[in-house]
Amino acid sequence: MDQKFSRFGQQREHLLERIFPEGIPTLWCPLITHYTDDGGIDRKRMRAHLEHISPYVGGFLLPGSTGDGWELSEAQSRQLIEYAIAETTVLGRKLLIGALGQKTDTVMDSIASSLALIRQLNGGDGTTAGIDGRPVCGFTVCGPSGKDLTQAQIRSGLQAVLDLGLPTSLYQLPQVTGNEISAQTIRELAALYPNFYLFKDTSGTDRVTASGFRNAILLRGAEGNYAQHLAGNGGHYDGFLLSTANGFARELHEVRSLLEQGSTTQAEALSTRLSTAVNEIFSFAQTLPDGNAFANANKAVDHFNAFGPAAVAVDAPMLRCGRRLPVRMLDFTGEVLKRHQLMPQSGYLQSVGRNAGTEQLKAA
């Protein structure tokens, strides 16, 4: 988690030193949302998952796309944020709050609602609203949605958010927004707003980092070829904010650790094996009629992490739509995990009977 702040400029450097006194996390996770049978937030199940991956993950994003952030009700988002603040405080991890919406007004309303909750929970003052890295370290926002938007329109929407003066992460997600924030727009915003301190790119095109932009923390959100994208191994990124950290946090952490130890061959071999498995699982998840592929793929992997090789015998996870993840998704995921030697020997949860639901689960 050691990162130098000097490249970011004095104002941004001071912000980062305040929010990340122990260093910038290099692996972040957009946490999946677990649901009870009646559609509520399953806090017990989420806590077990969070505790399982937190040894390898330094920061969390919630609610994000992987956690159904675009579909959650305001009440559900509030429940998740309140839960996440409490849990990450105990675990000593950082928390980015997702303020997702297709229009800037929706994003602004989401931020206002979250700020009110943060003030209520941790007594932040009117300036920082409690965003001091304990645990909340800012908001994550996408540009406004629309495939025909100009860069001027995208920039205007992002400026409205950045004008709030809050620590902010910008999220490149063309799969949802239908557009990309250009490298020039990112560069101009960074020059104007020192509170813009982190850029996450899930586009897979890497145009912003390829342009030489380095004035913010750079996290890659696109899956695959993990080793080659890290700075120090020929890449441009400081770390990852990956949906697969929900299920492969240990392996992703190990890729970076091996690179830092100089074991490049082993790191790239693990990266390739992991990339192949992830591609297969995600490709299958895209064929499912319900839910989004990010959530479905990661819930399937997490299900095996929770229950081990016999996970198919346990009720599948609930989806946002109120139906369970199809058993065929679990069958396929289990086969992929076994073939690529990624199947855990045992699960982090212990059921008390065959087909046990979440009400019957307890931490192992």
Predicted segments, located by residue:
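Generic N-terminal leader/processing signal
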Residues: 1-2, 13, 198, 297
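Active-site beta->alpha loop and helix N-cap motifs at the rims of alpha/beta catalytic domains
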Residues: 2-178, 314-324, 328, 337-363
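Catalytic alpha/beta core domains of metabolic enzymes, predominantly
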Residues: 160-169, 173-291
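Short, conserved catalytic or adaptor-binding loops enriched in Gly and charged residues
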Residues: 19-22, 130-132, 189, 233-234, ...
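Structured C-terminal cap/extension of enzyme domains
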Residues: 230-364
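A structural signal for short hydrophobic/aromatic patches embedded in well-ordered alpha helices
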Residues: 49, 80, 189, 267-270, ...
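A residue-level signal for beta-strand positions that form part of recognition/binding surfaces
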Residues: 24-26, 196, 295
